[in-house]
Structure formats: structure tokens, C-alpha cells
Amino acid sequence: MDSQRPEPREEEEEEQELRWMELDSEEALGTRTEGPSVVQGWGHLLQAVWRGPAGLVTQLLRQGASVEERDHAGRTPLHLAVLRGHAPLVRLLLQRGAPVGAVDRAGRTALHEAAWHGHSRVAELLLQRGASAAARSGTGLTPLHWAAALGHTLLAARLLEAPGPGPAAAEAEDARGWTAAHWAAAGGRLAVLELLAAGGAGLDGALLVAAAAGRGAALRFLLARGARVDARDGAGATALGLAAALGRSQDIEVLLGHGADPGIRDRHGRSALHRAAARGHLLAVQLLVTQGAEVDARDTLGLTPLHHASREGHVEVAGCLLDRGAQVDATGWLRKTPLHLAAERGHGPTVGLLLSRGASPTLRTQWAEVAQMPEGDLPQALPELGGGEKECEGIESTG
């Protein structure tokens, strides 16, 4: 007689598994590193797809479980199978009629999920079943946008080959006007940028994003591939202005080396020097003035870079600008001088510097106000802060 304990029947295994999931699914799923961990209200099929026993999923489908079941976020069993990268389950659900184009509450399809997680094999199954590579989420994002943002190069290449949009997918814009190249630049995804550039994608906007995100390698790559160095964003800023605002001195050097014009103004009249001075980026200011940036350029409010540096209390930057000949008593909006702006913000050291460089404490604004500190009288001039010749000495390229 066989002394071995008989194996439970398949039906019993599946029934035990389902009962376990009903009682303890939240604890079990909460140990996973991605995807949903709170499954209150999930039906049996959604739980089985996420838990993963293919035999149980098959049994539930035979018992009439709906492939169009939804969770709280509007995701179908197909969404969850794709999120897990579980190709056999994806194939099974598709064979049982799961709608390949179903969208969740955010407008995302299963192909969006595959693109986000880089599941190339699963994406291929979806595309073979007619998934649209041109599908857009609620914010206008296509699967290609997501693949580009996350650096899934092989998947991005497959999406560009998909029927429908084809190469034109590279120029599709989301709700903010970004293309796949913008998203790749934001993440510094050089391989994806190479793929897109080889297909003729526009790169000017991507250059601006690379500068704004501080992605130096992407910025250099895009310049080498022909992106226009003085392209402008919707606010009129160039890559040089965006890099200056971040104080990215190496990027500034690269852009200047490619012929970037430091005199270009944005729609508020601000030059790259205005932006660097306002943020207190001394090295960026030094680079720009050494390359001929206009030290007394005025924005639409009549403010010079010295006004901006003084208002924010950037005393070293103010000293550098004064060393380069900035007008200490330049008047701007409401006839305010740099001294007025530094004083009303309570920047004592900057006030002392300006006074030591000859700023007049008697000049009055449009409202006949002289410069005054919040606590009362102006501090004395601080001559020791006024020498400052070293602040704006010529800068050697750090190339």
C-alpha cells in the first residue's frame, strides 16, 4: 500500500488559495515593492492576478469572472498583469477577451503601464493585439513619453515602429507641450535621445529642458546633434538663462563656447546675468561678465543685475558687479536704487557695501522715500567689503 500522503486535488488547492487571499490579501500584498498594496474592495480575479497563481486565474475565468473587473483606480486585471510584467497572465487575459485599450481613471492603458515599467515582452503582446501606441493619458502622455522619461530605449524603439503614429510619435506633445525628447532630456536619458535624434526628432525644446534640469551630459549631446543654442522657451528664456539661474557654471561655459548670446532677454527683459545675480551664483556672474554680458542691462521694471543681487542680499555678487562698473545708484521701478532694495529687505552687509561704493542715502523713490532699514537707520559704510577687486577677476575656463 502506498504510504505517501495523497496530494490535495487541484480544486482543493485553488479553493484554499482563494480563501487565504480573501482573509489575508492585504498583508500579503503589502510586502511587495511596487504596485498596489491596499486591495480593499478588489474582486477575486484582481486579487488572483496580482497574487500570481496562473492556475487560479484560469479557474476563476472558467467560473465566469469578468476580465473587465475594475479596482478603485479603474484598473482592469490586464493593467495589473502588465504592471507585474507577467507575460503568461497577460497572454491568458488577452485570449479571454480582456479589452486591450481599456483605460483607468487617469486615462492610462495597459501599454502605458508596460512603458512605465519597461516590460518590453509584455508591450509586444499588447501591440500584437492592437494596443495603440498613440493612446494618451489624461495629461496627454503617450506610452513613448513614459518610455523616454524612464530610459527604456528598446521599448521606445519598438513604440516608434508601431503601426499608427510611427515616427510621428516622436513629435507628439503632452498637455504641457513636451515631446518624448523633452522627457528624455529631463531624465538625462542619452540612449533615448540618440534614438530620437537619429529619427529626426526636434531637439531645441529638449535642450531647454536639459539646461533647466541641470543635465549637463544631455545638454552637450543635444548641442552636438544640432540643437539651436539660442532657442527660447515660452517665457523667452534661452538655455543660457536657465543654466545661469541654476548656477551651472560648466553648462554656462559649454553654451558660451557654442556661441550662446548672453544679451538675449526673456519676456520680462531679464538676461542670463539678471538670473544669475538674483540667485547669488557668483561664479556664473563672473563667467557672464567676463564674456561681455551687459552689466547694467535693465529688465522691464528697469532693474539691473545689481538691483536683483542687492534685493536678495547677495553681497559678493553685488561686489563683483560693482567691480565691473555697475551703476551703484541706478534707478528702476518706482525710482528705487539698489540701496533702497537692500535696505527694505534688511540686508545690512549689502547696504554697507553699497554705501562704501558711493551709493547715495539721500536719493528718494517716486514716493519721496529714502533708503531705510526695517529697524531704522542705515548701517555705516563697510569699507572692508568694498575693495573686492578679486570678486570679478578674469575667470580661467575650467573646460
UniProtKB/Swiss-Prot annotation:
Protein name per the record: Ankyrin repeat domain-containing protein 65
Species assigned in the record: Homo sapiens (Human)
Region (Disordered): 377-399
Domain of life: Eukaryota
InterPro entries tied to this protein: Ankyrin_rpt, Ankyrin_rpt-contain_sf, Dendritic_Spine_Reg/Scaffold
ANK repeat locations: 40-69, 73-102, 106-135, 139-168, 176-205, 207-231, 235-264, 268-297, 301-330, 334-363
Gene3D superfamilies per the UniProt record, alphabetical: Ankyrin repeat-containing domain (1.25.40.20)
SMART domains: ANK
Alphabetic keyword roster: ANK repeat, Repeat
Isomerase listed as a keyword: no
Annotated SUPFAM superfamilies: Ankyrin repeat
Annotated signal sequence range: none
Source organism phylogeny: Eukaryota, Metazoa, Chordata, Craniata, Vertebrata
